[in-house]
A protein has these predicted regions:
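Amphipathic alpha-helical segments in structured regions that serve as interaction surfaces
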Residues: 3-20, 24-63, 68-83
Length: 84
């Protein structure tokens, strides 16, 4: 299972709210790009996958210079810190 549509919409909304100059298509594209990066990690646990996605969207929405890869890495580090 990939990222649920509900979470994709929430993630795209977080990005769009912080960058109103972006079109909704661009915000959705950014969210889908983050979802693809997470898919490449092969995370099997759905809760982890979805949580990392939302965190990565929030990181991107706070720092437009943050690459999708770095946002996902940062979200995964945060997951590991909280999980420890």
């Amino acid at each position: 299972m990939g990222i649920p549509q509900k979470s994709l919409v929430i993630g795209a909304c977080a990005i769009a709210c912080h960058y109103p100059e972006l079109s909704l298509n661009d915000a959705a594209g950014d969210a889908l790009q983050l979802a693809e990066k997470i898919r490449l990690y092969g995370i099997e646990e759905n809760q982890k996958k979805e949580t990392v996605f939302i965190a990565a969207c929030r990181f991107v929405s706070a720092d437009k210079d943050l690459t999708p890869q770095k946002a996902v890495e940062k979200a995964l580090r945060l997951w590991d810190i909280i999980e420890a």
